[in-house]
């Protein structure tokens, strides 16, 4: 779909807020009370070098062998991480950015980019398709419990997470 225009990304702030809640729980890991049930959460990995980030990205890539490759690079500044055209840019000097939750978020952008289907996506960058891909990715890369918590964090912010990708 050449020339597709990106839809307005109205859910970005709510997605970031939901992921901040989820990431804070992963910083601690361990057992949490989840509406009367006990969930065992992993402690999220923190990365100290670009080669470690790249190795993790490659482990995610191995879960999706039919999609185009993605690489990681250092990004100057410390205000945000970024995904564009098969490249995840991480400000390595910013400790907040060197976390597993950030890499999962940026890799989900790769899955949502449209390049995985050979076309440019016209979906909002943080819309329902992104969220369902992110939840599924977390279930594969981490645990079903972590995925359930992320889905609940999205829903607590009023964000729809579809049952599957259309």
Mark where each language-model region is:
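Metalloprotease/metallohydrolase-associated module, dominated by Zn2+-dependent proteases
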Residues: 4-98, 116-166
